[in-house]
Swiss-Prot record:
Major site of localization recorded for this protein: cytoplasm
Keywords, comma-separated and alphabetical: Cytoplasm, Gluconeogenesis, Glycolysis, Isomerase
Cellular component terms per the entry's GO annotation: cytosol
HAMAP family xref list: G6P_isomerase
NCBIfam families assigned to the protein according to its UniProt record, in alphabetical order: PGI_Meth (NF040629)
Compartments, as annotated in UniProt: Cytoplasm
EC number: 5.3.1.9
Top EC class for this record: isomerase
Active site, UniProt feature: 280, 301, 410
Keyword Isomerase: yes
Gene Ontology molecular function terms on file: carbohydrate derivative binding; glucose-6-phosphate isomerase activity; monosaccharide binding
Name of the protein: Probable glucose-6-phosphate isomerase
Family from the record: Belongs to the GPI family.
């Protein structure tokens, strides 16, 4: 199969974890409650609250036109942060591979943070005359995005680069929308009912991806192919519902940390996207699990000791791929047990070891297996987790689509940038308890 996703949850069950596990009867008892939750979600969808599902029916022709236009460029520069970056990056690296392992054109660069050294390094290594710039911010006022874009825009103007032909704006308001209209950039809107962390399959992700070799129709088709099962009222046929319920039950039992651990580097960025989705959607009113991103087998040599012998406050999710795009055989002329095996066998055996040692230590874990990593399976994975998060919001009784707690920090940052430097330092920066080494 080229597009299969399976969800295994044996290692959260009572028969494997004893009293720390979940009984089948407990899951069956959730069927009545889950049917009510699915009905609520369907009603919200009808009311236009689930834009992340609506975008699956968008006409893709505008993106195919952009694909043709993008062939005039050698580089793609993505300026965006948070939901305007993480999902897109997860899709691109998940499907195509990491930048260092690809040499196809266009080359893709991500400018997210307002770190001056990172921005400088990118601009020192990219030819802006051969670059199509995507600037992405739903609000149009994201500080980090505007700051980086203003710097890039100024450099392009100094080089007499036609901004109208080199800039693609993806926004629905604010300063970015103003300058988009004033300078006539190529423009895509972000639907009002699609939040940043749920926007990977909207224009935020699909427009830039259309300029690469990603088959955007297959990506959307992958999401559509799992949509029906993720709306099923039967918990035993719905992977999103089952995983949401499992995580909520484990949260009730003190599992306040959610470890996402793919055993393939190409899904490292998916883990980062999950980190935002899970934390920002559910971390409210004193609730929420802290997402921790690990990568097998690397993190076995850094974090696993804590998982096995530290506080038993974690539930782990393993991501496995059955068929790697490339594999290498280990050849060694001396007697050694590794000789003759493929690297895929090594990393798979390490996953088996970690999965079963966690079970042995009564640490709950689930596993998602993809037949291979491509547009279809990435589409399935994205939509499953978006639905799982929406369902979890209902289980916790919270709004999974806002993020009120981050606004205060933005307000202070704005005050620091617009007010007196001395006043800002005295009010927010200078401390009383400081240890300094000179």
């Amino acid at each position: 199969m080229n597009g299969e996703l399976s969800f295994k949850y044996d290692n959260v069950m009572e028969e494997n974890l004893g009293n720390l596990g979940i009984s089948n009867g407990k899951l069956e008892s959730f069927n009545n409650e889950s049917s009510k939750i699915i009905e609520i979600l369907k009603e919200k969808e009808l009311n236009g609250e689930f834009g992340f599902l609506d975008v699956l029916n968008d006409n893709l022709d505008k993106y195919y036109e952009l694909n043709e236009y993008s062939k005039n460029f050698e580089n793609i520069l993505i300026i965006g942060i948070g939901g305007s970056n993480l999902g897109l990056r997860a899709a691109e690296t998940g499907i195509l591979g990491s930048f260092t392992s690809r040499y196809e054109i266009p080359r893709i660069y991500y400018m997210d943070n307002s770190d001056p050294e990172k921005t400088h390094d990118i601009l020192s290594n990219i030819d802006l005359e051969k670059t199509l710039v995507f600037v992405i911010s739903k609000s149009g006022n994201t500080v980090e995005t505007l700051a980086n874009f203003f710097i890039v825009r100024n450099l392009m103007k100094k080089k007499n680069i036609d901004l109208e032909k080199h800039v693609v704006s993806i926004t629905s308001g604010g300063e970015l929308e103003k300058i988009t209209k004033k300078e006539n950039y190529i423009h895509f809107e972000v639907p009002e009912n699609v939040g940043g962390r749920f926007s990977v399959l909207s224009s935020v992700g699909i427009a830039p991806l259309s300029c690469t070799s990603v088959d955007i129709k297959k990506l959307i088709d992958g999401a559509k192919s799992i949509e029906k099962s993720c709306k099923c009222e039967d918990i035993f046929k719905n992977p999103a519902l089952m995983n949401a319920v499992i995580h909520k039950l484990m949260y009730n039992r003190g599992k306040t940390v959610s470890v996402m651990m793919p055993y393939i580097e190409r899904l490292r960025s998916f883990g980062m996207w999950y980190g935002q989705l899970w934390a920002e959607s559910l971390g409210k009113n004193g609730f929420g699990q802290t997402p921790v991103i690990a990568v097998g087998a690397t993190s076995q040599h850094s974090q696993l000791q804590l998982y096995m012998d530290g506080p038993n406050d974690k539930i782990a999710t393993f991501l496995k791929v059955n068929k790697y795009r490339n594999d290498l055989k280990i050849e060694y002329e001396y007697d050694h047990h590794l000789s003759g095996h493929n690297l895929s066998e090594v990393i798979t055996s390490e996953l088996v070891g970690t999965e079963n040692s966690m079970k042995h230590n009564n640490i709950p874990n689930v596993k998602i297996t993809l037949s291979k990593l491509n547009e279809i399976t990435m589409g399935k994975l994205f939509l499953m987790y978006e639905m799982q998060t929406a369902i979890s919001g209902e289980l916790y009784g919270i709004n999974a689509f806002d993020q009120p707690a981050v606004e205060y920090g933005k307000k202070i940052a704005h005050e620091c940038l617009t007010g007196s430097k001395v006043d800002s330092e005295n009010k927010y920066i200078n401390g009383k308890y400081i240890i300094t080494s000179k």
